[in-house]
Amino acid sequence: MNHNGGDATVVDPMAQKVVATIPVGGVLEFPTSDGAGKVFVNVDDKSEIAAIDVKTLQTVAHWPMKDCKSPTGLACVPGPKPLVSSCGENGVAKVLSAETGAEVASLPIAIGADAVLYDAKRDVVLIPCRAGELEVISIADAAHISVVQRVPTQEGSRTATLDPDTGRIYAMAAKFGPPANPGGRPQALPGTFEVLVIAP
């Protein structure tokens, strides 16, 4: 995904060449796949999810997300379950049908979400937020999707990865000072980087 280019580049790794460029439009954030021929990507500036058909190499849908500002992280739950998108600017998690784009749920979460992780063994979605919380969302029952736990982490920790076997989450963290320029982002202080390990 080309973040500011508004398109997706398809690369043949064996031939080491670009085989297609797929127009999507907008500022592209995190993509995910359903494993069955569709790729989905958050379009930050349009507050929508775009769907790409891998076989035809075309964008086939644009699904707007009402009341979602700056969608970044995105996870696709395999099977009949949904897409989960984190709206980082206004503290919302949007849950959409991966087939139709219809909204299934809209959940309040902490501000500054980025990554969205799916833990298949525990059937939960995990969203680390810059405000210092890890949101745990149960999707075991499609009719009752909800935030079931808010785990305190560290302010600024919003990107993480998951060990699918143990369920442990590894989140990047640091101490922050004031922005370098007024209105800018807080600056990480040298020598304060660490990895938070969160057990299920």
PLM feature segments, named:
Residues 1-200:
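Predominantly soluble domains enriched in secretory-pathway, periplasmic, or organellar proteins
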